[in-house]
């Protein structure tokens, strides 16, 4: 499939995912293209060319005057598919693509890195809405529970799409939700651990270290059962809430020493 894509796009069909191939694939990985306006272009012609919709283009470019396009002007054109896949394993690189895609499709979505993981991967926080009621959702504290990440991201995408179209989510007007509340999502708390579990972590010292830790607990499947971050720390046990009880439970399960 990769070689066929390379041939179609005039690239060397070597089957290698190199820099040129990555650039050519970027619109399909991130869900949008950046089009440079040419004489005669209209939003309708762009929607036809990219198999998209006028509404999606207008949502992605809120300051755009559709009747005054200028040659050389750059326009974000959403492509006709979801940015958030739910049928493949997730990883930190996929999260980066999804964050980029959603913020370009829905510029009102605010994204920031609130920190870095042990391996320097960004820990993203995404905020939608400007209401007084503030709500925080987080996912993937535990690496082997990564399925919570696409669940949260798909909810966010569904909410943003519905708000842009004036539709409802579970019977509630999406625009009203974002007017009344500010929703902040931290959808991948443990990017390194998730990369380990889903097979995206490359070979190297970090992976060798996790294998050594896992060898001390042979009853836990490795890497599928890995819950901690890449340093062996259970992130969900780092909050001052019932910590003594959690420690007693972990000791009873045989986790009686630091990793």
Could you describe each region identified by the protein language model?
Residues 124-132, 140:
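Short beta-strand-to-loop junctions in surface cap/lid or active-site-entrance loops
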Residues 3-12:
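Extended, structured, electrostatic nucleic-acid-contact surfaces
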Residues 1-3, 23, 27-52, 73, ...:
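Primarily a LysM-type cell-wall glycan-binding module
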Residues 2, 120, 140, 185, ...:
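Divalent metal-coordination and catalytic microenvironments
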Residues 56, 78-119:
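Short glycine- and acidic-rich boundary segments immediately preceding or forming the N-terminal edge
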Residues 132, 146-259:
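Active-site/substrate-binding loop(s) of hydrolase catalytic cores
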